[in-house]
């Protein structure tokens, strides 16, 4: 749903798939684990504008937290919730669902927006003795940003592949600000070409 034709299509979202596949190939060639997060909302999710009778992208509150009300998207078991068909999915070792609780949104792959519940991602990474992450995807200014900030808070070293990200950009500079926030918090930003070059 975040790609062309989807309910919450991110501008140029499809352009990230080629970058993702190149990064997957890079990881596989070095024996690095590839994982994905997946929005997995119930049809009555409280972040949906349709549940409140308002226009999509209207600001408001959900369970005491600031909330942008979104078009219905990534409804569990719908076509829109699936990973992109051109993504090299066989290489993905684990997929972590988020946004399953209808009462709170979940931008981060680690926690819901209220940090009341965590996904199994942190435990999985620690079980596999992974302490450094390479993050990319959709959308820069929401899921990528909050996943990266949470990962840094949890003590991971985080690298962000900037050309593998695209933003919603409700405000025109939201993605640029998100990259600045991630960098200021301790993430290292690379294009994929720079990453491949620096890693040898």
How does the language model describe each region?
Residues 1-102, 108-109, 127, 131, ...:
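Active-site acidic carboxylates
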Residues 130-146, 160-165:
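Glycine-rich anion-binding loop/nest that anchors nucleotide
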Residues 23-24, 144-155:
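Histidine-anchored nucleotide/phosphate-binding helix
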